[in-house]
């Protein structure tokens, strides 16, 4: 299982790189779970990241505005991101989510056929009125995405496992694999929960808080020693 770590600036990105993260995922925590950072931060992070190491960019907890979201996705793509992560926050149904992701996929793949598109739903979708997390694999498949992902929308200390049990998460992983895609799971994941994600076949685990001082995604800073500990658990 590979590790995605989400820095908010280049200094944190260096810590994640030195700690051994596999994917450097640029985000902006004050703007939400999948808060979008600025194009120049993505560009600077890409320049700071070793060649061959992939850079991801979250483009926001997005509304149901396909044109707006598509432009954001293209902005992240041309800024140097290899993975484009879309948080399907304002989409209320399969059809709305599909509408957003089909257009994002078209824009991203037209700009770079090797770019990777991630459709991200929320395990706690019921708290914010977002699309059912269990339809995300179908949305991703039908939109031509590469990865189906789950995160949590509300960052209040509850983790992925507070909203979906292991059986439901296993169902999500297995359906995603059945459709020939990779599966990514995140959501205030604690280091001791990572072995359970490995057990159900998760391909990519995403963290920020667990790699930050005081375990605080907002006030804390990513530290390479914390990243190293998480990498070790992912590799064991």
From Swiss-Prot:
Q: Which reactions does this protein catalyse?
A: 2 D-glyceraldehyde 3-phosphate = 4-(hydroxymethyl)-2-furancarboxaldehyde phosphate + phosphate + 2 H2O
Q: Give the matching InterPro entries.
A: 4HFCP_synth (IPR007565), 4HFCP_synth_arc (IPR035081)
The record's disulfide annotation reads none
Question: What highest taxon heads this organism's lineage?
Answer: Archaea
Molecular function as annotated in GO:
carbon-carbon lyase activity
Coiled-coil boundaries? none
Q: Which GO terms describe its biological process?
A: methanofuran biosynthetic process
UniProt entry keywords in alphabetical sequence: Lyase, Schiff base
Q: What residues sit in the active site?
A: 27, 85
Q: Name one Pfam family in it.
A: 4HFCP_synth
User: Part of which pathway?
Assistant: Cofactor biosynthesis; methanofuran biosynthesis
The UniProt record lists the EC number as 4.2.3.153
Family, according to the entry, reads as follows: Belongs to the MfnB family.
Its job = Catalyzes the formation of 4-(hydroxymethyl)-2-furancarboxaldehyde phosphate (4-HFC-P) from two molecules of glyceraldehyde-3-P (GA-3-P).
How is this protein named in the record? (5-formylfuran-3-yl)methyl phosphate synthase
**Organism of origin:** Methanococcus maripaludis (strain DSM 14266 / JCM 13030 / NBRC 101832 / S2 / LL)
Which gene is transcribed and translated to give this protein? mfnB
């Amino acid at each position: 299982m590979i590790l995605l770590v989400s820095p908010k600036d280049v200094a944190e990105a260096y810590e994640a790189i030195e700690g051994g993260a596999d994917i450097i995922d640029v985000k902006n925590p004050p703007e939400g779970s999948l808060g979008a950072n600025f194009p120049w931060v993505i560009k600077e992070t890409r320049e700071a990241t070793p060649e061959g190491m992939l850079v991801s960019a979250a483009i926001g907890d997005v509304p149901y505005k396909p044109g707006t979201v598509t432009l954001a996705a293209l902005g992240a793509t041309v800024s140097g991101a290899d993975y484009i992560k879309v948080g399907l926050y304002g989409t209320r149904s399969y059809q709305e989510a599909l509408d957003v992701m089909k257009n994002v996929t078209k824009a991203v793949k037209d700009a770079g056929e090797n770019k990777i598109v991630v459709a991200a739903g929320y395990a706690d979708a019921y708290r914010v009125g977002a699309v059912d997390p269990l339809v995300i694999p179908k949305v991703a498949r039908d939109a031509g995405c590469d990865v189906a992902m789950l995160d949590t929308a509300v960052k209040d200390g509850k983790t992925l496992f507070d909203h979906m049990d292991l059986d439901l998460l296993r169902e999500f992983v297995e359906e995603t694999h059945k459709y020939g895609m990779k599966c990514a799971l995140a959501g205030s994941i604690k280091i001791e929960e990572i072995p359970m994600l490995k057990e159900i076949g998760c391909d990519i685990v995403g963290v920020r808080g667990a790699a930050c001082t005081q375990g605080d995604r907002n006030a804390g800073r990513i530290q390479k020693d914390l990243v190293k500990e998480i990498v070790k658990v992912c590799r064991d």
